[in-house]
């Protein structure tokens, strides 16, 4: 297919804006291919024309990693189910789909067949390709990265080749592609291992901050799914714990900020505290917390709800936001949270900076067995994953020294802790983040942490590579980069990723926004 024919199927007046509204771009051409063959032709045209391609889905990464002035591709039209194979003896099925299919669409299709995705992150708007490309995870002592549910991938690499990948066929490329940052190839098809549909019976408790820390050793392994929302100014935590059940659904929990009125009031109060009177922030938190959750500690007697797996695992992310998420060993959690608590309190007293809430605290188990276990004794409500693969992505940001243990032996020593620092952008207006995020990153880094690839980590000019500006020339929210630390953290795995990237994309078709890759050590300047 000639370039003229390829370009004839593209738009030249398209503006891409990410969900948070922080970044936007106007690509030279915007493509929405209708087939894998069209993807191949677009890649070959890019090689011929010396262009780069970025693939985007829902745009939920709040960073600038997808910004480009060259070619942009969206796979929403690649949304077909290719094959559905049941393994009734071990209670799972392998579903093969085109990778532009959104997760919420896949969940609807699976529900019609009596199946569900095993574990999800906070949202379901991502595509099948996008959800694994930056290391999405849920919150569970038994489940790890969403990519561990993937049996195989089909990619179009930077040579225009259609390549099938799994644990046996090109396992090294598979490890790179299951967390690729969009730099290995375009994922066009995937097979995901799913399980019989289930509901989640959850208990939601209001507890004191100290209660969380005092029960740290046992809380995190007390349910299959668990997460906390920390409100530092009120010194309260909302503890959510859930397990699979076949019990019928109950009425959803009431949500003050889930109403149009509550949501508007909350966002308006944030706007006032950001733009007019920052010292109001702790009082806004207290008011909102009491409206949403009440005033009484309910540890051991929280409210119980039965939801679909999707409703239970997803959450309302509220407003446009900056997000800085880091992961570290769970055993370092109490020290980290006490340090952050002290810093947040001191900063408020000195009117240095104020944080928005909640600060989300989650865990995952990204340790992997040497081989896929026997699942013949599972039931529909058995805890834990049915692995699609047991290969760790080279760029997995979770701690590397943690060792696998069977579900019955899992302790905090197998688990990674994720802490999510969020600053809202009320009504689409920016809020200051640099002081808080820098302190947060220093604290997490000292605890053996690393940032989530897709989030708004800042880094520092001392760690960056490529075009480094004077500190005064950066916008408050602008990423400086972390090249030197990322090289140190990932070591041989990063070198292997680079080698595979060069092999699969020798023409640098997928090196759009090269500055982002350089300042974070993905490639050399």
UniProtKB/Swiss-Prot annotation:
Compartments it resides in: Mitochondrion membrane
Catalytic activity of the protein: D-arabinono-1,4-lactone + O2 = dehydro-D-arabinono-1,4-lactone + H2O2 + H(+)
Chief site of localization: mitochondrion
Domain FAD-binding PCMH-type: from-to ranges: 23-197
Coiled-coil boundaries: none
Any Pfam family matching the protein: FAD_binding_4
Cofactor: FAD
Chain segments annotated as transmembrane: none
Gene Ontology MF term list: D-arabinono-1,4-lactone oxidase activity; FAD binding
UniProt keywords, alphabetically: FAD, Flavoprotein, Membrane, Mitochondrion, Oxidoreductase
SUPFAM superfamilies given in the database record: FAD-binding/transporter-associated domain-like
Listed pathway(s): Cofactor biosynthesis; D-erythroascorbate biosynthesis; dehydro-D-arabinono-1,4-lactone from D-arabinose: step 2/2
E.C. code: 1.1.3.37
Residues found modified as Pros-8alpha-FAD histidine: 60
Any one of the GO CC terms: mitochondrial membrane
Family as reported in the entry's similarity comment: Belongs to the oxygen-dependent FAD-linked oxidoreductase family.
PANTHER family registered for this protein in UniProt: D-ARABINONO-1,4-LACTONE OXIDASE, L-GULONOLACTONE OXIDASE
NCBIfam families: FAD_lactone_ox (TIGR01678)
Protein name per its UniProtKB record: D-arabinono-1,4-lactone oxidase
Provenance organism: Kluyveromyces lactis (strain ATCC 8585 / CBS 2359 / DSM 70799 / NBRC 1267 / NRRL Y-1140 / WM37)
């Amino acid at each position: 297919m000639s370039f003229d024919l390829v370009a004839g199927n593209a738009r030249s007046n398209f503006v891409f804006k990410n969900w948070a509204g922080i970044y936007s771009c106007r690509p030279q051409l915007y493509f929405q291919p209708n087939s894998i063959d069209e993807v191949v032709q677009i890649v070959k045209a890019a090689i011929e024309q010396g262009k780069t391609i970025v693939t985007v889905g829902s745009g939920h990464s709040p960073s600038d990693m997808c910004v480009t002035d060259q070619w942009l591709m969206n796979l929403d039209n690649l949304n077909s189910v290719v094959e559905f194979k049941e393994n009734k003896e071990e209670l799972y099925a392998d579903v093969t789909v085109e990778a532009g299919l959104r997760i919420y669409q896949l969940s609807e299709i699976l529900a019609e067949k009596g199946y569900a995705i095993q574990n999800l992150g906070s949202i379901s708007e991502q595509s099948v390709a996008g959800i694994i490309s930056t290391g999405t995870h849920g919150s569970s002592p038994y489940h790890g990265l969403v990519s561990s549910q993937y049996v195989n991938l089909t990619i179009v690499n930077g040579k225009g080749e259609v390549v099938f990948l799994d644990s046996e066929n090109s396992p090294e490329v598979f490890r790179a592609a299951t967390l690729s940052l969009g730099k290995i190839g375009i994922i066009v098809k995937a097979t995901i291992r799913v399980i019989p549909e289930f509901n989640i019976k959850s208990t939601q408790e209001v507890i004191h901050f100290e209660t969380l820390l005092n029960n740290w050793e046992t809380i995190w392994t007390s349910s299959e799914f668990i997460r906390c929302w920390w409100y530092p100014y009120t010194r309260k935590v909302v503890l959510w714990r859930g397990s699979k059940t076949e019990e019928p659904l109950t009425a959803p929990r009431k949500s003050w900020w889930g109403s149009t009125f509550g949501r508007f009031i909350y966002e308006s109060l944030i706007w006032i505290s950001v733009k007019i009177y920052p010292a109001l922030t702790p009082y806004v938190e207290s008011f909102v917390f009491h409206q949403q959750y009440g005033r009484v500690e309910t540890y051991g007697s929280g409210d119980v709800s039965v939801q679909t797996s999707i409703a239970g695992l997803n959450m309302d992310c509220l407003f446009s936001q900056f997000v800085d998420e880091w992961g570290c060993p769970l055993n370092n959690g109490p020290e980290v949270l006490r340090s952050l608590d002290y810093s947040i309190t001191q900063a408020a007293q000195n009117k240095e900076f104020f944080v928005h809430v909640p600060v989300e605290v989650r865990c995952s188990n990204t340790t992997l067995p040497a081989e896929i276990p026997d699942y013949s004794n599972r039931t529909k409500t058995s805890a834990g994953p049915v692995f699609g693969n047991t290969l760790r992505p080279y760029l997995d940001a979770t701690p590397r020294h943690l060792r696998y243990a069977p579900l019955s032996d899992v302790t905090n020593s197998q688990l990674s802790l994720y802490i999510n620092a969020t600053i809202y952008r009320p009504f689409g207006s920016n809020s200051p983040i640099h002081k808080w995020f820098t302190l947060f990153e220093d604290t997490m880094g000292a605890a053996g942490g690393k940032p989530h690839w897709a989030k708004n980590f800042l880094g520092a000019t001392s760690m960056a590579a490529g075009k480094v500006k004077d500190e005064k020339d950066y916008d408050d929210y602008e990423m400086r980069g972390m090249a030197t630390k990322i090289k140190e953290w990932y070591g041989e795995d990063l070198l292997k990723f680079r080698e595979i990237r060069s092999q699969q994309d020798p023409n640098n078709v997928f090196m759009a926004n090269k500055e982002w890759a350089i300042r974070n050590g993905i490639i050399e300047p």
